[in-house]
Structures are given as C-alpha cells and as structure tokens.
C-alpha cells in the first residue's frame, strides 16, 4: 500500500499510473481518511473520518498542521501493517518529537526561544505557520542561517517569500557545507530583499567574545513577549544556546 497526502494535486497526478493500493489522507473531503476538527495549538487535537464515519480521535504533544498530518499518515501506515488501532493510537499520542524540530530551548526576560532544523522554503513555511497558530498576536523573531549556496540559488524566490512573514529576521552568513560561493547569492542579498531583515555579519562557527557584538545587536532589537527561533541546518542552534547564555549574563 502507498499512503499519500491527497491534498496535493501533484501527488495525485504522480500516483495515477500506479496499480498498487493507494490510501489518501488529508484535510480535504475527497481523501480516504479526512482530518477534521483540528486544534493545531500546543497539543494538536483532531478527529479522523473514514468514508464519512468517525474512525478515531487523536491528541499529539506537537503543534502545527504539518505534525497533525504526519501523525495521521503514521496511524494509517501502522494499521495497514497490521497494528491494531488502539495500539497505534497510543504509540502516536506518546511520541514527543525529535530534537531540532520545534524544540523549546528557554525563556529569558519574557522572550521564549525555540530551535528548528528547517532549511527549505516548504519546511520554513510550516514552521512559521505553527508558531503563528501557537502564539497568536506575539512577535515572531527569526535567526536564519542560509544553508548551501546551490539551495539558496535554486529556491531564491521561495526563500524570500517565506522570510517576509516574520516580524523580524536576522540573517547570518551562508553555511557553505563545502560548496563554492555563487556570485550574488549572499546574506546581504537576502537582507536587501526582505524589508524586515537585518544582517548578522557573522559565521556560526565563531566562538567566544567574537560573538558579543552580534549578541548585543540582537539584544537591542528583541522585546519581552517575543518568540525567537533559530532556523537552519548548520550551526545556528549552537549560536542560539550561546545567545541565551549571553542574555542571561547581561539582563
């Protein structure tokens, strides 16, 4: 069996030639399993319907529509593999997530810090939507470390579109991951394209007091009640931890 998100027309087109059993899930009514009554906040709660009849209810300790959809896919795959519904439901409801995915880090002077591994526009969009759902009305501040010159070049317009969504974005130098720089693909170019962005002209591999001027730059901009997120696949999570230490020492 193939378990696919039927909300995406492209996936349905790709699956059309296959003769295997295909099970579609999602938010739309034309799916085999439909997710309804979604509350995508601190804990996602939702109901699952199959052929217009209620199949089960789920509550997972992870926020966001994408996590709700992922958990529904896991539930369907589990039952298709022969696991009974009650056991599958309990297992999914007890799953607490993984590191670097919407990971709570700390709170300093009313500022809440999270970390997420998101480094592709689709992931980033889902992350931002989750924070907006969980913390409506609060300022979203993002510390973004671009990852790979080629990825930034290939998805440039998509990155710029998503990075315009937060209230403030700090952009570090691009984490090269052994790639050769590409002319025009720079942190400065990102900042120039995103009105609410500031350049953190730093390398996330730096350590010690060399980081302090950039931490001071951040401290001057963030406010109590902000939601701050380190975002990227390089070393930005380590910088986030050092930033928290700095803010505690300079409160």
Question: Each predicted region: which residue ranges?
Answer:
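Active-site beta-alpha connecting loops in nucleotide-dependent enzymes
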Residues: 98, 129-195, 200, 204-211
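Acidic, Mg2+-coordinating active-site environments of NTP-dependent enzymes
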Residues: 1-113, 188-193, 197-198
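Short glycine-/acidic-enriched loop or helix-start segments at secondary-structure transitions
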Residues: 12-15, 34, 152-153, 180-181, ...
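Short glycine-rich anion-binding loops that position phosphate/pyrophosphate groups of nucleotides
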Residues: 8-9, 119, 146-149, 174-177, ...
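Active-site glycine- and acidic-residue-rich loops that bind
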Residues: 115-124, 147-154
